[in-house]
């Protein structure tokens, strides 16, 4: 791997044989968010790519992603220092994959979604978040032990506390209250 610069951004490039598929991940530190604001980052990750932008409807955007990309997704992660588990950093992640010849589409669509998403359709946002709530309930029913283990981890690991707020039972409770 190698570290490089592209404008104001630092890049880490891995040269791995991927059979003509390019993968790009962009990490945004969430250091500026207070703890009680962290669940809103998950809400943002849930709705980005599923709402209209200034140039395309959500349906058109979905068609473009299906036609030109393998994936365009958003998530939140917690990164832990391998040496010091007290040092954690929540990150907002945008990931995309595309065939090598479609990389310009990946860059263009990712930028459009990040910069031009229209958040005015509150009913659509409510629907998306309602689907997320239902999916979480189904996951609790089918793999409740995993949710319980993550919840227990929040009692002794700093990263567990943040994960709980971003995607665990804590986030589920936040989401229920929000809806």
Put a short name on every predicted segment.
Residues 1-22:
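N- or domain-start disorder-to-order transition segments that initiate the globular core
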Residues 20-49, 56-116, 122-179:
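M16 family metallopeptidases and their MPP-like homologs
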């Amino acid at each position: 791997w190698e570290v490089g610069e592209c404008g104001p951004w630092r890049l880490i490039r891995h040269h791995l044989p991927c059979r003509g598929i390019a993968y790009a991940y962009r990490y945004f530190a969430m250091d500026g968010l207070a703890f009680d604001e962290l669940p809103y980052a998950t809400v943002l990750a849930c709705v980005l790519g599923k709402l209209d932008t200034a140039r395309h409807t959500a349906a058109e955007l979905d068609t473009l992603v299906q036609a030109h990309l393998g994936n365009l997704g958003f998530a939140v992660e917690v990164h832990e220092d391998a040496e010091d588990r007290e040092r954690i950093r929540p990150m907002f992640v945008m990931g995309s994959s595309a065939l090598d010849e479609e990389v310009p589409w990946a860059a263009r669509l990712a930028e459009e979604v990040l910069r031009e998403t229209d958040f005015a359709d509150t009913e659509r946002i409510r629907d998306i978040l309602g689907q997320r709530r239902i999916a979480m309930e189904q996951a609790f029913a089918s793999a409740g032990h995993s949710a319980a283990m993550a919840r227990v981890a929040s009692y002794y690991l700093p990263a567990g506390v943040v994960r709980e707020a971003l995607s665990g039972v804590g986030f589920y409770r936040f989401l229920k209250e929000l809806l």
